[in-house]
Amino acid sequence: MGGETIRDILDNGKARLNGQERLVLQPNGGEYPLRHWLMHNGYRIVGEELLHENRFYYEIIVAEPTGPVSYTEQQLYFGPLQLLARSPAFVAKWQRLLQQKQKTLASFEKARQSVPEEKVHGIAREIQWITQLLT
């Protein structure tokens, strides 16, 4: 299940959360919106793990309610604890995604129909962040 779906389930079930729970989440993509929801709902990310099996990456996020917490855009994008640990799987994942995003940006330039500038700028920003991360 993707991070957006997990976020929506958590948001719709807020009344059932008692403020004492530890959330152990495994989004298949969409980690940014899930981390964003956690931050805006007072959950601190206390554990992150990235596993690589076959050709897939699996991310596990553990969060606990702590009250207000603040993360930068890059921390939300990469994972605050992942940024600190920079495991071999983490570096490999972002090297792979950098290549994919560069191909995407190049295909935008060749597209017959114009791509919204917002989308182009978003991909370019992500490429910049990943490049900075890997250097």
Predicted features by range, described:
Residues 1-11:
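Ordered, amphipathic secondary-structure segments that act as subunit-interaction surfaces
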Residues 66, 70-135:
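An accessory alpha-helical subdomain
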Residues 9-13, 54-58, 75-87:
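Short, surface-exposed, charge-dense and proline/glycine-enriched linear segments
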